[in-house]
């Protein structure tokens, strides 16, 4: 096992001037499970392929442990890779597929069999060792691909969207198995996905990329609670965070018919940038619903005593999920229509076409600079 270091590693494809990966700088600890996540074209798979030796590194360096592997061929890096497609040999049994790399390396049959059986036991594949891949389900085939990587006992596992071909239910159970197995083996793992739910549930840390640039690397909890900028705020979380540009007013920001208090430091930082507005982020679960004619929360002040507190939201769609419900609606903010998502109790969902008044909880408010997108609140 070993640590992995991306030291300002860059990749520029021939014929392009814009880097696909731009000075990526991440230190991955020995035994850590790091997830690279981002939209299509952000550079996450390219970063993984650079680490694997399948892409040239045009600037910076990549190290595995104390070794600079920047220009080493893949076979000399002591890594094992699991792909989106299983890449199993259809004419070979499960056991032969899992042990094939060891056979090519000249390991004796007894040792190969022992390692294959040990990996099969970990992956619940013992009863399938004599079967061909066509006799397995998608989840079982993916576990065979995992087993093939495990028997090699590499220093680093690389996984490129290994769950993309599985159905939703199987994806949930398999991601749990992969995370549990990685913790048991303690092998440093770099995992690529476009699914931020996978990223949050599997990784010790998550690295978010956009247009080849690292936006933030942090624990899943910190990334959810303290996104570094507007992109991360809008990308991490399902349903996504509501992002609303609101005017700065005395002591806070104007939110519908209420003034929501915001720290003076954040407002000063926005003013120093010449901004007269800030963009506030509110998770769907951090809205309070105000009854018609009811008062605002104690921490809020109202512009008018006649109107309900907060922002009027027209209910367009309601998703009932048992314990919770999600209201998808629209509101007028600064003369523009904004789509909002509000979480409500599963037993108290509003009717489609009705109107809610909502206020954000001040302690849960995220404040970003409208001009730059960077976070202003602690």
Give residue ranges: language-model regions:
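ABC ATPase nucleotide-binding domain
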Residues: 5, 27, 63, 357-359
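ABC ATPase nucleotide-binding domains
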Residues: 74-231, 235
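A short, flexible loop at the N-terminus of ABC-type nucleotide-binding domains that lies
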Residues: 1-3, 11-23, 72-76
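The feature captures the beta-strand-to-loop junction immediately N-terminal to the Walker
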Residues: 37-39
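Non-catalytic connector elements of ABC transporters
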Residues: 239, 252-378
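ATP-binding/catalytic-site motifs of ATP-hydrolyzing domains
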Residues: 61-63, 67, 213
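Conserved post-Walker A/P-loop segment of ABC ATPase nucleotide-binding domains
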Residues: 15, 55-63
